[in-house]
Amino acid sequence: MGIIKEIFGKVRIYQLRSRVDSRGFMSYVFDENIYDFSIKEARIYSMPKEGTFFGIHYKEESSPMTKLVTVIKGKGMDYVIDLRKGSPTYLQWESIELSEEN
């Protein structure tokens, strides 16, 4: 498990540590010995219809929030937009396809 990509110096894409054997599939979603942040809240969402747009989440720099997003089944797009005024990457964006494979 490690960082495979960093976006805007703030957003990190991690490769989860997982294994498959005769018993099935196992993946570490969070390990405090690896990540440099803590988790205060956990949520699980289900989007049963293809093409569902879930929402836009915005946080002020003065009250940052760490989010750990993973896809258990299927795939989805996650978008990151730099809205920090004065940032050299202001208004730039990237998309990341998340899936059960990554």
Model-flagged regions — what are they?
Residues 1-101:
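Non-catalytic, conserved peripheral segments adjacent to functional cores
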